[in-house]
């Protein structure tokens, strides 16, 4: 059994635990990290596939993906599939895992903005 060890595990940045994510957001992020192509940082799972992996409904996964995108952890873009009949259909989203540094900067900027707004109110 000569398997590449990099296919049996994935890494998670330690900073993920300091960004105020709830457990389900972390689970969705971890699943996307697990599936990502380590050269392109991209993957294409369906909402249903993600939901089955993390034990959440499709609509709930959609909300978590939106939250991860808003927090700068992932970006998404629609894809399309050309069927044999020639009909073009919507495909799964293409997820790109963003550098953790970007998410940390967004998190700190939002915290600073909240502190400034609170100071203005006083």
Which stretches of residues belong to each language-model region?
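Electropositive, intrinsically flexible nucleic-acid-contacting patches
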Residues: 1-122
């Amino acid at each position: 059994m000569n398997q590449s060890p990099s296919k049996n595990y994935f890494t998670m940045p330690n900073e993920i635990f300091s960004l105020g994510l709830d457990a389900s957001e972390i689970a969705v992020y971890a699943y996307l990290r697990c599936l990502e192509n380590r050269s392109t940082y991209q993957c294409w799972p369906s909402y249903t596939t993600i939901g089955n992996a993390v034990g959440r409904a499709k609509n709930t996964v959609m909300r978590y993906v939106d939250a991860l995108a808003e927090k700068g952890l992932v970006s998404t873009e629609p894809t399309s599939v050309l069927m044999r009949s020639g009909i073009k259909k919507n495909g799964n989203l293409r997820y790109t895992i963003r550098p953790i540094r970007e998410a940390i900067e967004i998190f700190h900027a939002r915290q600073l903005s909240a502190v400034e707004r609170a100071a203005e109110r006083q």
